[in-house]
């Protein structure tokens, strides 16, 4: 994900606590997949499975299909996708997506011209793609600069740790979103880093009863940082 001194200087001037995290962590390098079709398929494959399992299945798909595009997906069909380790439902989602791209009912090139809100709405209309997944596609495929996901438990965990809050509700979240805009995507990288333990001394201020949320947040950190 491309960013530089301009974005970091802006964020550090806007937020002293985030500035401390940025200084300790340094630049964060994250790979992106700028092929929108394969990015959507990759995210569908990875839902509700471990990062390791996702990587294994994805490699099988690339080995079998050669190129992951609408034509190769449709030529394979559900019956040949399933033996690669993909569930029947996910295989249906993937082939449905390929059909919509092929017949033009989903304008995949047109997405690039949409606003963030419009792109999220269109992507999340696809079977198997929710709002959070659409937001991750905007960030790690389309490289949109201002993505901050309220539905991302790891983002919320990072915010709790950096700003010492017990809970991040929508009102508080929007306050930070406004403060960090128009470079929320870069801020997201540092919230994930904090949530993953990259900053010694930071702790999660969520109530002890939130143990399940903390576990899910940790899993989401792994998923996002490995994608």
PLM feature spans:
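Short amphipathic alpha-helical interaction patches enriched in hydrophobic/aromatic residues
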Residues: 44, 77, 81, 105, ...
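A general alpha-helix detector
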Residues: 39-44, 76-80, 118-122, 136, ...
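Alpha-helical ds-nucleic-acid-binding substructure associated with the helix-hairpin-helix region
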Residues: 17-21, 49-50, 54-125, 179-181
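Flexible, active-site-adjacent loop/turn segments at secondary-structure boundaries
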Residues: 26-28, 35-38, 47, 84, ...
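C-terminal accessory module of base-excision DNA glycosylases/AP lyases that mediates lesion recognition
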Residues: 1-28, 92, 117, 131-140, ...
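A positional/architectural concept
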Residues: 6, 13-59, 63-66
């Amino acid at each position: 994900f491309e960013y530089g001194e301009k974005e970091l200087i802006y964020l550090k001037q806007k937020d002293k606590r985030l500035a401390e995290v940025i200084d300790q962590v340094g630049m964060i390098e994250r790979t992106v997949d700028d092929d929108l079709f394969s990015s959507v398929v990759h995210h569908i494959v990875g839902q509700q499975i471990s990062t390791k399992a996702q990587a294994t299945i994805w490699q099988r798909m690339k080995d079998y299909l050669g190129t992951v595009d609408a034509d190769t997906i449709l030529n394979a069909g559900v019956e040949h996708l399933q033996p690669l380790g993909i569930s029947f439902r996910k295989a249906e989602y993937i082939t449905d997506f390929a059909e919509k791209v092929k017949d033009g009912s989903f304008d995949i090139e047109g997405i690039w011209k949409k606003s963030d809100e419009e792109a999220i709405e269109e992507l999340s209309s696809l079977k198997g793609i929710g709002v959070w997944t659409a937001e991750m596609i905007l960030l790690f495929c389309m490289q949109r600069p201002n993505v901050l996901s309220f539905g991302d438990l790891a983002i919320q965990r990072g915010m709790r740790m950096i700003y010492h809050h017990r809970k991040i509700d929508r009102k508080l979240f929007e306050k930070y979103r406004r403060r960090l805009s128009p470079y929320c995507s870069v801020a997201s990288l540092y919230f994930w880093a904090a949530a993953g333990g990259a900053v010694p001394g930071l702790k999660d201020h969520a109530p002890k009863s939130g143990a399940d949320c903390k576990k899910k947040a940790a899993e989401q950190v792994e998923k996002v940082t490995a994608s």
